């Protein structure tokens, strides 16, 4: 078996609020294999976003092991963490966070330029991804000229642009109506599978979770 893309061992995180400490993650263990698509379920406030932030190396304050593509992130400096994130991870959020002044294709090209990809190669890759998501005729549209589902598709293309081994998605279809959410998730999963990326997708939707390879649940700070 190949090495996991993500390995968590005894991941812990507490927050202090008004003098009270809450232990949100109380020893989370998880391994995700290359290409595996995992649904992360759990009630509101159970710590799904906190867990994704840990794996995404976006926040500090965690204890335990966070290993990305075989590298122990806790041993890295800030710059090296940024490089590890950029080289291996892609992100999709509930709200797309697209750059409002750039059109669809530029939103997918820019992260590739940041990663050092040649512009012509980046443009071809962006056009291919957006076309696979049905947006071939929307390449020059700015986010404000796109529907909510189309905006989220651009965000999916952006997350995959640098060929991440792992996509982290936090309620990626949570702000869409049910029919659109189903369609966007379907396309997202198809594209992720086609690319061979792994994914960890936090969702409240049990029905959509059943379309993934494995379901894990956060309950009282641990995965079950
Ligand atoms: N920066 C913070 N400071 C204090 N408390 C926090 C912070 N971030 C998260 N929390 C608390 O940690 C708990 C878990 O939050 P988190 O957002 O991870 O849950 P979630 O499962 O993603 O919820 P939802 O499904 O509603 O998005 C909540 O009680 C929240 O209030």
Swiss-Prot record:
In which compartments does the protein localize? Cell inner membrane
Quick check: keyword Translocase in the entry?
yes
Name the Enzyme Commission number(s) assigned to this protein.
7.6.2.-
Q: Which GO terms describe its molecular function?
A: ATP binding; ATP hydrolysis activity; transmembrane transporter activity
A GO biological process of this protein is: lipoprotein localization to outer membrane
InterPro entries recorded: AAA+_ATPase, ABC_transporter-like_ATP-bd, ABC_transporter-like_CS, ABC_transpr_LolD-like, MacB-like_ATP-bd, P-loop_NTPase
Q: Which UniProt keywords apply?
A: ATP-binding, Cell inner membrane, Cell membrane, Membrane, Nucleotide-binding, Translocase, Transport
Show the SUPFAM superfamilies listed in the entry: P-loop containing nucleoside triphosphate hydrolases
Q: Name one GO cellular component term.
A: plasma membrane
Segments passing through the bilayer? none
Provide the membrane topology annotation: Peripheral membrane protein
Q: What class of enzyme is it?
A: translocase
Positions contributing to ATP binding? 42-49
Protein family (similarity comment)? Belongs to the ABC transporter superfamily. Lipoprotein translocase (TC 3.A.1.125) family.
Job description of the protein: Part of the ABC transporter complex LolCDE involved in the translocation of mature outer membrane-directed lipoproteins, from the inner membrane to the periplasmic chaperone, LolA. Responsible for the formation of the LolA-lipoprotein complex in an ATP-dependent manner.
User: Oligomeric state and partners?
Assistant: The complex is composed of two ATP-binding proteins (LolD) and two transmembrane proteins (LolC and LolE).
Q: What is this protein called?
A: Lipoprotein-releasing system ATP-binding protein LolD
Question: Which gene is this protein's source?
Answer: lolD
